[in-house]
């Protein structure tokens, strides 16, 4: 391709809307263009990158025995109601775009395709002889993100590969799950990226086990906790660990003490000269279920620990049937405005005890009249602890479960693991932290969808059983931007060869120099002929502008037909190292073929 014929515009300044390096560079280098909030156009250079990523993904999926198909983006609401996810995905903080057609039929724009594929399997799969089967597609998805940001990282329209497998047994599912794990490792490795596979929370997709594939990058939205021995890695949402040992409480006798202006853990520790590990703090949450019922949740946890909202959400979803609900729509720490809607009297915030009385809750329809009390394992172990006294300016010291306070019946693990915690598999090791960008996620779904939607098969014994499912997603457009986030410098993008839009760019410093043009044209033709995908910068621009643009767009190799032509050579510059060498014109093609491994 000739740059003079390409829709190609670069920017010298960072766009104001861009927050992270990869977003800035893709906009500046003319790869993408913002059309609206979270909506981007993929311009010619970017489309080539996306096609290459898609092809690598396609090849690895095919090699693993999956079959490509294409599913509808418009999905009937009744399918999602059948699975029980319509309310979750369209109400409160739901991410599905929903619409009503001219026949007053509700539809959703697909954020994912479990319901559609399960319906197809329900209608087409009858016998164990048809199993296992693994279907995948590469298409645009739509999600109504609350806060679209970071360009293609968190957009409202994006390209994704999603796959769904069906099985007659758990063993068969695990076999495919492992095959997908290896396929994903192959995909990301072939794209030339550093990554870490980590244990993950299954979220709204559900299932018994899941794993994320994280591209390591400082601007990553996710925190990964891992051990140096490589035996443990998990998203912080899922991570488990051993917290530091608690220090002994300085109080051995139960007593209510005046503690003025100590409504934070830090202030309380200073006032009482105690460790935060000797404190039980009580955190109030407001949970809204899909049947409209609001439950006030009181979580007791050790004072130096924080509640992991994802773990807490999972616990509350598990408890949903107790409230005649199926899932959770929203979870928040209620602010003054939210409290005013249900609090019968002012709450002693900062001084709440585990036994906060239920009469703080007004008698209102759809507000559960009693607190749901949960206690984290870290708080259960404490003796002679310090906690609130349900009165502003006062705390209880020297308290114990079973004496001053009744231990809640629901003992849970909802603490947030942190860097520096001890590893469960080897307490000598401590957890390290890294930032990551999630580009892939694989799930063992089990029978969650097939059971809800009546997708069954007949097994070898002639029994009707629900299909066992797995699902596997790769963010194609996100992976492409993650590559930039992992590999750039002050001058621009540094694409890995495998997914670069072009392998090489031939730059003509002076288009009025006939020899420069002639040699450039010859190299451009010969390189493309042997499979070295080459761009020709034949624009009527200053040489400096061309060199700057070449570095900005990140093509792996730059060939310059400049002054060295007088000695029968051209300059070859490697983008990643900026190493420059002069090579004979007749050696350029073979040299490039070896460098990019054609």
From Swiss-Prot:
Keywords: Aminoacyl-tRNA synthetase, ATP-binding, Cytoplasm, Ligase, Nucleotide-binding, Protein biosynthesis
A biological process from GO: prolyl-tRNA aminoacylation
Major enzyme class: ligase
EC number: 6.1.1.15
Source species, domain of life: Bacteria
Pfam families linked: HGTP_anticodon, tRNA-synt_2b, tRNA_edit
Localization in the cell: Cytoplasm
Molecular function per GO: aminoacyl-tRNA deacylase activity; ATP binding; proline-tRNA ligase activity
Catalytic activity: tRNA(Pro) + L-proline + ATP = L-prolyl-tRNA(Pro) + AMP + diphosphate
Gene Ontology CC entries for this record: cytosol
Cross-referenced InterPro entries: aa-tRNA-synt_IIb, aa-tRNA-synth_II, aa-tRNA-synth_II/BPL/LPL, Anticodon-bd, Anticodon-bd_dom_sf, Pro-tRNA-ligase_IIa, Pro-tRNA-synth_IIa_bac-type, Pro-tRNA-Synthase_IIa_type1
Keyword RNA-binding: no
Main location: cytoplasm
SUPFAM superfamilies: Class II aaRS ABD-related (SSF52954), Class II aaRS and biotin synthetases (SSF55681), YbaK/ProRS associated domain (SSF55826)
Subunit structure: Homodimer.
Entry similarity comment: Belongs to the class-II aminoacyl-tRNA synthetase family. ProS type 1 subfamily.
PANTHER family listed in its UniProt record: MITOCHONDRIAL RIBOSOME PROTEIN L39/PROLYL-TRNA LIGASE FAMILY MEMBER (PTHR42753), PROLINE--TRNA LIGASE (PTHR42753:SF2)
Entry note about domains: Consists of three domains: the N-terminal catalytic domain, the editing domain and the C-terminal anticodon-binding domain.
Function per UniProt: Catalyzes the attachment of proline to tRNA(Pro) in a two-step reaction: proline is first activated by ATP to form Pro-AMP and then transferred to the acceptor end of tRNA(Pro). As ProRS can inadvertently accommodate and process non-cognate amino acids such as alanine and cysteine, to avoid such errors it has two additional distinct editing activities against alanine. One activity is designated as 'pretransfer' editing and involves the tRNA(Pro)-independent hydrolysis of activated Ala-AMP.
Name under which the protein is recorded: Proline--tRNA ligase
Lineage: Bacteria, Bacillati, Cyanobacteriota, Cyanophyceae, Oscillatoriophycideae
Gene that specifies this protein: proS
């Amino acid at each position: 391709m000739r740059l003079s014929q390409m829709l190609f515009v670069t920017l010298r300044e960072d766009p104001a809307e861009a927050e992270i390096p990869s977003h800035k560079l893709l906009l500046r280098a003319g790869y993408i263009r913002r059309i609206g909030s979270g909506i981007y156009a993929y311009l010619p250079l970017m489309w080539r990158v996306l096609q290459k990523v898609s092809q690598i993904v396609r090849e690895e999926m095919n090699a693993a025995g999956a079959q490509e198909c294409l599913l509808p983006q418009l999905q009937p609401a009744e399918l999602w109601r059948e699975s029980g996810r319509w309310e979750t995905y369209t109400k409160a903080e739901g991410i599905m775009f929903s619409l009503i057609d001219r026949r007053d039929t509700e539809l959703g724009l697909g954020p994912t395709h479990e319901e559609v594929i399960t319906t197809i399997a329900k209608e087409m799969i009858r016998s164990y002889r048809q199993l296992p089967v693994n279907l995948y597609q590469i298409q645009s998805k739509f999600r109504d993100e609350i806060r679209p940001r970071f360009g293609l990282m968190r957009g409202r329209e994006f390209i994704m590969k999603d796959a769904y497998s069906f099985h007659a047994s758990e063993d068969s599912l695990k076999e495919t799950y492992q095959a997908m794990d290896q396929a994903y490792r192959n995909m990301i490795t072939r794209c030339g990226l550093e990554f870490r596979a980590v244990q993950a929370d299954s979220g709204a997709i559900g299932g018994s086990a899941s794993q994320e594939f994280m591209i390591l990058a400082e601007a990553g939205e996710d925190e990964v906790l891992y051990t140096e021995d490589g035996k443990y890695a998990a998203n912080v949402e899922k991570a488990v660990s051993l917290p530091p040992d608690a220090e002994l409480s300085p109080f051995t006798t139960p007593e209510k003490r005046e503690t003025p202006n100590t409504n934070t853990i830090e202030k309380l520790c200073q006032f009482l000269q105690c460790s935060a590990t000797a404190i039980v703090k009580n955190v109030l949450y407001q949970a809204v279920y899909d049947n409209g019922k609001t439950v006030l949740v009181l979580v007791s946890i050790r004072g130096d620990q924080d509640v992991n909202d994802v773990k807490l959400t999972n616990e509350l979803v598990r408890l949903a049937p107790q409230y005649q609900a199926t899932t959770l729509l929203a979870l928040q720490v209620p602010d003054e405005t939210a409290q005013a809607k249900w609090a019968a009297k002012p709450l002693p915030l900062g001084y709440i005890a585990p036994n906060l009385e239920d009469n703080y809750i007004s008698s209102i329809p759809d507000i559960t009249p009693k607190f749901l009390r949960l206690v984290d394992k870290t708080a259960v172990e404490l003796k002679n602890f310090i906690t609130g006294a349900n009165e502003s300016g006062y705390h209880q010291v020297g308290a114990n479960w079973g004496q001053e306070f009744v231990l809640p019946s629901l003992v849970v693990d909802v603490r947030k693991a942190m860097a520096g915690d001890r590893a469960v598999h080897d307490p000598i090791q401590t957890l390290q932290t890294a930032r990551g960008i999630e580009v892939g996620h694989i799930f063992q779904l089990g029978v969650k969808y097939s059971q809800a939607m009546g997708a069954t098969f007949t097994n070898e014994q002639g029994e009707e059983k629900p299909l066992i499912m797995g699902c596997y997603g790769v963010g194609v457009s996100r992976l492409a931007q993650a590559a930039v986030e992992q590999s750039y410098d002050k001058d621009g993008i540094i694409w890995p060869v495998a997914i670069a839009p072009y392998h090489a760019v031939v730059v003509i410093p002076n288009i009025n120099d006939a020899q420069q043009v002639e040699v450039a044209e010859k190299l451009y033709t010969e390189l493309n002929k042997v499979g070295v995908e080459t761009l020709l910068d034949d624009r009527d621009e200053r040489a400096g502008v061309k060199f700057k643009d070449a570095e900005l767009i990140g093509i792996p190799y730059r060939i310059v037909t400049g002054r060295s032509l007088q000695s029968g050579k051209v300059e070859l510059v490697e983008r990643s190292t900026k190493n420059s060498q002069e090579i004979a014109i007749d050696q350029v093609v073979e040299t490039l073929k070896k460098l990019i491994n054609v």
